[in-house]
Amino acid sequence: MVLNPSKYQDTRTWKMTPAMIRARKPFFKGNMLGLTLLLGVTGSVYYYTYHFLHKDNDFADVPIPPIDPQELEALKKEYEAKKKA
């Protein structure tokens, strides 16, 4: 499938012709404003989600029981054995 050459592009370099550049010029500022608005809203949603909803303290009130060193060594050996298998 061969693309037909556009009259708004140079057939040798595929760059826009001066006519195409002139046709797009009035829309440039509006497009940049829309892009800025879209990126701003998206960034704001991500910022809000990460910073305000990321405060995960569900288990902050659950105390962690102390563990003695022998039990810790036994758990480490068990973990290493499962890791190798």
Curated annotation (Swiss-Prot):
This is Cytochrome c oxidase assembly factor 3, mitochondrial. Keywords: Membrane, Mitochondrion, Mitochondrion inner membrane, Transmembrane, Transmembrane helix. One of its GO terms (biological process) is mitochondrial cytochrome c oxidase assembly. Belongs to the COA3 family. The chain crosses the membrane at residues 27-49. Residues 50-85 are mitochondrial intermembrane. Residues 1-26 are mitochondrial matrix. It is found in: Mitochondrion inner membrane. Present with 2530 molecules/cell in log phase SD medium. Coiled coil: none annotated. Component of 250-400 kDa complexes called cytochrome oxidase assembly intermediates or COA complexes composed at least COA3, COX14, COX5A, SHY1 and SSC1. Interacts with COX1 and MSS51. GO terms for cellular component: mitochondrial inner membrane; mitochondrion. It is a single-pass membrane protein. Its main location: mitochondrion. It comes from Saccharomyces cerevisiae (strain ATCC 204508 / S288c).
